[in-house]
C-alpha cells in the first residue's frame, strides 16, 4: 500500500504496524498510521494533500507551521488564564526535515499528530454543541491574531 511506504518516510520511531484509511474527508485522503516500539506506540494522521484544492501544498504546510507555532506560543503565555486543555496538531517532520513528503507521482503527503479525544461531526448535535464550537472558533481567532 502506498500510504504505508509514505508513512515510513516520516521521522517516527519504531516499526510500522498499520496505515489504514480513516474518516470521511471530502478533500484529502486520510490514513490512521500506527508505529510501535518495544515500549510505546505512536498514532498519527497521514494525509495526501489534494493538489486540485490546494495547488501549492508546500505553502499550505508553511502556513500550518507558522500558525500552529504562533498559537502554541500564545497558549503557553496564557496558560495561567485557562483551566482548559488546548490541543493542536503537531506537524511530524519527514526524515529529510521537511514538513511533507513528495512521492514519485508528485503528490504531497503530510503527517500530523493524532488528537485522540477529537471527534468530527457532520452536523451540530445540540445547542450546547453549537455554543462550544463557537467558543472554540472564537478562541482560535483570538489566538491567531
Q: Where does each model-flagged region fall?
A:
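A short, low-complexity linker immediately N-terminal to eukaryotic Hanks-type protein kinase catalytic domains
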Residues: 2-15
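Conserved ATP-binding subdomain of kinase catalytic cores across diverse folds
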Residues: 18-145
